[in-house]
């Protein structure tokens, strides 16, 4: 069963919600279900939940005036609570911004230009990946809540575990797709047609490349055919792109590996030879290492259910290399957006406060009991 939890301080919207849910109760199937609950919420104004205690979405409602005030007094940083909730429950986050549509950008709302409010809303979407829904008034907000609630109750919400390991085929498709012009569809065909080692060794004749077709029986694009033929002839730039598609091997590392030799040279050598390659970094020189070397040999020789081997030194299916975590990569990637020191401190403070209360549900979501109060105090301060 799905249900909506509304914060008891949402006095202006709750009457409309009660009316809207009353109409929903006319449905015989939902007649005896308590779809709307009014409680005190500590994060957000509304929670869309699934029985027994799974949080699917958290919604914060603000008028333009409230939004402007939050920018001035610092309550805008309260979004960290919502971000922490999403981290713990994998729920979706929404901001309802209430007010007339498209006012003049220079119009002052609570002494804040509307253009500044739009900028803050854009940052919420781009930086924090929070959905923004604009509404006209309280009644319209209630309607949008009902639409959102109905969509969640009818759609299967599937949360993919972040630790899900991709299959060999998926990784090999990604490898082929590192080449410009090769889509996931063509990448899958290549992954199950030949190995990279097969191509760079010239064992896939150009006439065979010319006969490759898509699932719709159309020939490969001419650009892709020329690129595959150039790889078979030892084009170093394309070899670097292919090698960079191997897990934990980026473009810089691939270029360093192929600095003095072609890709085929390493595929014809024992794995130990590749593992001993010296990689020059800014302050030191390191070896490529056995794990990366095994990954290179494994994925460049992978072909469908049966890999095409170049020599007896290649590793077997049973010894598939364990992918190194992101922290072990040679070239680390900086986050797209850096969180401010103040926001980080707020998030850390919230995380430490919530750590002792954290209880995981069997599905991997957090229970909602920590985000609502069992008893509502009549003296609770208004938002």
UniProtKB/Swiss-Prot annotation:
Induction cue: Expressed in the late phase of the viral replicative cycle.
Bias kind Polar residues: ranges: 357-367
Pfam families: ERCC4
GO BP terms in the entry: DNA catabolic process; double-strand break repair via break-induced replication; symbiont-mediated suppression of host innate immune response; symbiont-mediated suppression of host type I interferon-mediated signaling pathway
Residue spans of biased composition, Basic and acidic residues class: 347-356
EC number: 3.1.4.-
Function: Plays a role in the inhibition of type I interferon signaling pathway. Mechanistically, specifically interacts with 2',3'-cGAMP and cleaves it via its phosphodiesterase activity. In turn, prevents 2',3'-cGAMP interaction with host ER-resident STING1 leading to inhibition of downstream signaling pathway and type I interferon production.
Listed name of the protein: ERCC4 domain-containing protein EP364R
Organism listed in the record: African swine fever virus (isolate Tick/Malawi/Lil 20-1/1983)
């Amino acid at each position: 069963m799905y249900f909506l939890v509304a914060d008891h301080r949402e006095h202006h919207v709750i009457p409309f919600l009660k009316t809207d849910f009353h109409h929903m109760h006319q449905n015989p199937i939902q007649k005896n279900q308590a779809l709307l609950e009014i409680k005190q919420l500590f994060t957000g104004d509304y929670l869309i939940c699934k029985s027994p205690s799974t949080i699917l979405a958290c919604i914060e409602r603000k008028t333009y005036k409230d939004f402007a005030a939050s920018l001035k007094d610092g309550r805008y940083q309260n979004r960290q609570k919502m971000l922490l909730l999403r981290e713990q429950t994998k729920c979706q986050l929404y901001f309802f911004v209430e007010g007339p549509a498209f006012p003049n950008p220079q119009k002052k709302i609570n002494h804040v230009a509307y253009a500044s409010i739009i900028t803050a809303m854009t940052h919420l979407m781009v930086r924090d990946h929070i959905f923004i829904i604009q509404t006209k008034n309280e009644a319209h907000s209630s309607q949008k809540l009902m639409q959102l609630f109905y969509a969640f109750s009818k759609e299967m919400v599937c949360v993919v575990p972040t630790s899900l390991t991709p299959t060999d085929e998926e990784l090999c498709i990604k490898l082929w797709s590192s080449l410009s012009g090769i889509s996931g569809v063509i990448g899958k065909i290549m992954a199950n047609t030949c190995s990279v080692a097969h191509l760079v060794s010239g064992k896939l004749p150009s006439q065979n490349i010319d006969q490759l077709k898509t699932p719709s029986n159309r020939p490969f694009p001419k650009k892709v055919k020329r690129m595959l033929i150039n790889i078979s002839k030892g084009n170093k730039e394309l070899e670097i792109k292919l090698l960079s598609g191997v897990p934990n091997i980026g473009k810089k590392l691939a270029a360093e590996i192929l600095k003095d030799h072609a890709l085929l040279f390493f595929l014809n050598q024992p794995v130990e030879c590749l593992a001993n390659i010296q990689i020059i970094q800014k302050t030191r020189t390191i070896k490529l290492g056995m794990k990366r070397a095994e990954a290179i040999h494994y994925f460049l020789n992978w072909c469908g259910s049966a890999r095409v081997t170049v020599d007896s030194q290649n590793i077997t299916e049973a010894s598939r290399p364990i992918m190194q975590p992101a922290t072990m990569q040679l070239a680390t990637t900086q986050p797209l957006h850096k969180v401010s020191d103040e926001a980080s401190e707020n998030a850390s403070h919230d995380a430490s406060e919530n750590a002792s209360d954290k209880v995981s549900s069997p599905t991997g979501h957090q229970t909602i009991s920590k985000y609502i109060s069992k008893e509502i105090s009549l003296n609770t301060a208004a938002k």
